[in-house]
């Protein structure tokens, strides 16, 4: 509940900054927009489930609101998983050497993922204010590169737990949580790409 409240607050503040209108989005229209937009993602059901909780903060047909919200959620969940994995090393006193090294590497690459997603959230906000096509495309290229790299970081963490010799319980716990984050990040990247494509055609 605390994490969801944190995500809600960050999204509320971020979208308030981005909005040029103070009008409250219609819940039904926003829900329809979310469902339609999520069909372009690799995990549409997860996409809808993740974003629907914040439908009232996403303006109808506003692809930037949608992409921004998806990125913020991805960032919050990546942070949560990084904290979880770090705590796991402290709460579980005995690890095989292979497990310990895999967890250590995982914490490092997840930290990189968090940094890249945080950069992406800020850059996407700046891209929304771009008045020239070249400036917009440059900023969106940065966002796409960083989110893609964040997804690679998350996948790299999973690779460390792919060996059969890896302990079952630790492997299941970490894989379950990191797979979820990777899927959320994948969806966010798809929505970022969608925003970049739609917005770019509007420039002269």
Curated annotation (Swiss-Prot):
Its main location: secreted. SUPFAM superfamilies: Plant invertase/pectin methylesterase inhibitor. SMART domains: PMEI (SM00856). Coiled coil: none annotated. It comes from the Eukaryota. Transmembrane segments: none annotated. The keyword Secreted applies. Keywords: Apoplast, Disulfide bond, Glycoprotein, Secreted, Signal. It is found in: Secreted, Extracellular space, Apoplast. Highly expressed in roots and etiolated hypocotyls. Expressed in seedlings, leaves, stems, siliques, floral buds and mature seeds. GO terms for molecular function: pectinesterase inhibitor activity. GO terms for cellular component: apoplast. Disulfide bonds join 38-47, 106-157. Glycans are attached at residue 26. The keyword Secreted applies. InterPro entries: Invertase/methylesterase_inhib, Pectinesterase_inhib_dom, PME_Inhibitor. Belongs to the PMEI family. Binds reversibly to PME3 to inhibit its activity; the stability of the PME3-PMEI9 complex and the inhibition of the pectin methylesterase (PME) activity is pH-dependent, based on protonation status of amino-acids at the complex interface. Pectin methylesterase (PME) inhibitor that probably targets root-expressed PME and PME3 in a moderate pH-dependent manner, mainly in slightly acidic conditions (pH 6.3 and 5.0) and to some extent at pH 7.5; this processus relies on changes in the protonation of amino acids involved in intermolecular and intramolecular interactions. Regulates de-methylesterification of pectins in roots and affects root growth. This is Pectinesterase inhibitor 9.
